[in-house]
Amino acid sequence: VSISRYFGARRFRLGAAALAGTSLMALAAAVQAGEVRGRVIDANTGALLEGAALQILENGRQSTSDRSGGFAVADLAAGQYTVIARYTGYQPVTQTVVVDQDGVVPIELRLGGELTGTELGDIVVTGARAAQARALQVKRTAPTIIEALSADDVGKLPDANAADAVQRLPGVSISIDQGEGRYVIVRGVDSNLNNVTVNGQIFPGPEGGSRRVALDTFPSDIISRVEIVKALTPDMDANAVGGSINLVTASAFDRPGGFGYGSATVGYNDKSGNTPYSANLSWGRLFGSADQFGVVLGLSHSFRDYESDTIEGGGYRPVNGQILPDSQVFRDYSIERQRTGVVANFEWKPNDEWRLFANNTFTRYADDEERDSLTVQYALGTLTNATPTSGQYSGGRGTIELRSRKVVQTLYNLSAGARYAAGPWTLDLNGVYADAAEDTPRRIDWEFRSATNAFPNTYSASGPFLDIRSPNLQDPARYPFRRVRRRTDDVQEDTYSLGFDLRYDLDQASNFLKAGARYVQRDKSWDRQNTNFTGTRTPFLLSAVSGRGPDDFFDDRFSFGPVVDFPAAEAVFRDNLANFIPDPATTVTDSLVTDFDVEEKVAAGYGMASAELRGVTVIAGVRVEHTDADYSAYDLQRLGGVLTGTPLRDGGTRYTNVLPSVHLRAEPMEDLVLRAAWSNTIGRPNYTDIVPRRDFNFDETSAGVFRGSISEGNPDLKPFESMNLDFSAEYYLTPAGIISLGLFYKDIENPIYNRTIDQTNTTIDGQFFSLLTTTRPENAASGTIRGIELNYQQQFTSLPSPFDGLGLSANGTLTGSSTELFGRTDDIPFFRQSDTLGNVALFYEKYGLSARLALAHRSGYLEALNAPGLDLYVADRNQLDFKASYRLREGIEVFGSILNINDEPLETYLGDESRVSSREIYSWSASAGVSFRF
C-alpha cells in the first residue's frame, strides 16, 4: 500500500522523523558497563525455554529469552539485583546477582516442574499441558499479534501434515484435497496471499502458476513449532495480505542434554480397506569441548493408499421448467500418496557473541492416482412424459474416461547465516537458496464417447442428485474411442535471498532501533509437453479394453459401470501406434498454452524503532519493497482451429510499495495484554495471471470480417494492497490458559478477478472483428474483510481428582467481506472467505493417559464466479477427530486415533445450497502406533 494513499510522502517523512526523534529522546540513558547474561531452563526436561519474561526488580529493566533460552540485560550500574523469570504454566523463579562495574555475570534460571495453582501430584509440564503453555508463552511475549502451535500439540491429533495441524488455530481454515488439508487460509484470505517461511526464511511453492505453498507436502513430524503472524512488523516480508506462516524446525540448543524421538504408525481406511503407515525419527546433540557445536537430524516418511468417490453436476440451466444440471459426472479415485521429510541443521556457537548456522530442509511429496469417470449428458433429443421432477429424453450421451497421473513435488531449502551479539548490538546475516519443483512424469487421459442419441433415458430430480436410467448405458460396445492425451509437466522455481538485520538495544529489551535490507530473486518456469491422438484408422471400442468398475460406488447408492483397463489400453496403444491418428494442432497448443518464464527481483529495506512510553510498548517503522519482474510466454493464434503462429511475447512490471506500520502492546494489569496494530501489506499476482500469455481463436465469417475470442494474462496487473487494522485483548489464566478477543479489518485495493468483455466492430492486429470476446484477469476497485476472533483455553486443575486432568480449547471466528466487482451489482465476498470458523477440543491428561476429542468447523466459501446466482461455493464442513495415548514407561507411549469419525464429505453448490454441484466422500480412517523419546 503506497503511503500516499493516506497522506503525502513528504508529510510522512516529517512524521517519521518526529517519531524517531521522540523515541530517541525517550530512550536516552546513561551507559553502564555491567551485564547480566543467562538462560532459562525447564527443570523437568532440560529444554531451553523461549519467550520467558525476565525482569530486574530494582529498576524494572526487562528482557525476553530467545530460542536458546538466552537473555541479556546490559548497561547495569554496579550493585545487587534480583532477577525474576516468568513463564506460562510455571511458578516464577527469582535469583539474586551481584554486578561489578564491568564484566558479565552469568545466571541460570531453572523453572520448576509443577504447573502453578494447585498441588498436582503426577501432573507435570509435559504433553498437551506443556504444549499449550509453550504456545501461550510465545503468543504472550510476542511483539505483535501471533498464533503458535508447538510440536507436542501438533502430535496430539491425527494430523498428517502441517496444514491439518494449523486449522486448529483461531482465524485459520484450510482447503482440503482428498480428505487432507492442503492450503492454509488465514482470516478468509486466499492462500496465494500468505507468506510461508521455514525458520523465518523465505520458502517457494512448487506449483505451476500460483504463489501458494501446499503445506500437505510438509510432514507434521519434522516441525518443532508453527507460528502464524497476523499483523506484520517492518522486518518481515510484506507479501502477506492474510498473514505469515513460519514453520520452525528443531535446534540442538533447544535441549542441551540432547534429544531423540520417533514413532511408527499403521492405519486403516474404511473406504478402501487399505493400511497406510508412517515412521519418523529425530535426533539432536551438542558436541565439542565446550558443547559449541550442535546437530539435528530428522527423517519422516509416510505412505497412504486410499479411495474416494465423487458425484458432480454439470452446468445448471433450465430443464423442463427447473434449474437442473445438464449432465452428471461419476468419479472414482484410487490414490497413493507418499511424503518424505528430511531435516539437517548444523550450528556453531564458538562463544557467547557468535552463532553460525546452516539449516537444510527437504520434502518430497508424490501423488500417484487413477481416476475413472462416467459423464452422462441426459438432456438430449425430445422431452416426453414430463413432470415437475422427472421426464424422458429420446437421446443421451455417455463419456467414459480414465486419467492416470503421477505428480512429484520436491522442496529444498538451505538457509545459512550468522548472528553476532555483543553489548547493545545484534547483527544477523542470512542467505537462502531454495529449490521447488513439480514434476509430472505421467499424465495420460483416455476417453471413449458414445453418439448423442445412444442412450434414451428417464431422469428423476427428487433428490440432491439426478437418478438417470438408460438400459444400455453400461454397455462398453456403445463407447467408441475419442482421444488419448499424453502429457508431462516440469515446473521449476529457484529462489535466492540475501539479507541483514541490525539492532541496537537501548536501556531495556523493549527499547531498540532496528534496520535491515533483503534482496530476493525468483526464477520460475513451466514447461509442458503434450502429445494428442484424436481418432483411430480402424474402429476401436471400449469393449476391447474395458474393466469392471467399483462395486460399492458411493456406498452402493449408484451403479458406476465399465471402466478403462489402463494396462490393457496402454498395451493396445504401444502395440498399434500406427492405428492412432495424431492431432498436431492441439498437440502444439496444449504444449505451449501454459508455458512461461519469470524472473522476479525484490529489493527491500526497512527501519523501525521500539520504545516503552508510559507502560505502552510502541513499535513504529516503515518497509519499502521494489519489485522488478520480466516475463515471457507464448501467443497462440488459431484461424478456424488451424494454428497460424506461436510467437513469444515478453512483458514486465516495475513498482514500489511504501509500507508503514505501528504496533502497540500494553499490560495494564497482571495477566492482561492489550494489542493494537496498523500495518500495510501487499499480495503479488499469481504467475499465470501476470505473464503475457495469449490464446487467440478466430474465424472469418465473411471476406475481411472475423469473430473470435482471446484468453490472456495481464502484465499490467497491480498487486493487492491491504491496509490492516488489528486489536486484541488477551487475559492469561492460571495455570496455563487464555481468554482472548481479537478484531480485525482489511481494506484491500486492487483485488484480482477474471473479466470477460465483448467488443463489437473493433480492429485488433490489423483485422476487423464484428465480435471479439476477451477474458483476462483485471484489478477490481477494492474490497474489505472484517472479523472477530474469540479464543478460550484452560486446564481445569482445580477440579477434584480425577477430573483435574481435564482441559478445554475452543475458538471461533466471525468474518464478513465484500468487494466491488465489474459487471456485478450483488454482494460478492472474497474467494475462500468463510463467515464462521470454529474449533472445540476437550482433552484429558493424567495417570499417563492423554486423550483429545476435537471438532473443526468451517462454513461455506466462494470458490469460483459464474453467472449471477450460480457462483460455485464450497459447503459447510464439520469434522470430528479423536486421539489417545498412554505412557507405558518413561519415554515410551502407545497411541491410537480416528480421523473423520462423522464421515464428513466435501460438498460444493451453485448459488443456492439446494443446487448441489458435487459431493466427495472419504469415510473414516484409524491408526495406531508407538512413540519413544530418549
Residue ranges: model-predicted function:
Residues 207-212, 221-228, 235-318, 323-326, ...:
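Outer-membrane beta-barrel translocator/receptor signature
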Residues 857-864, 885-934:
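C-terminal beta-signal and adjacent terminal beta-strands/loops
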Residues 59-72:
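Short, acidic Ser/Thr/Gly-rich low-complexity loop/linker segments typical of extracellular
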Residues 743-748, 757-759, 763-862, 902:
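Gram-negative outer-membrane beta-barrel transporters
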Residues 394-413, 590, 594-603, 653, ...:
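Outer-membrane beta-barrel signature, preferentially recognizing the C-terminal barrel domain
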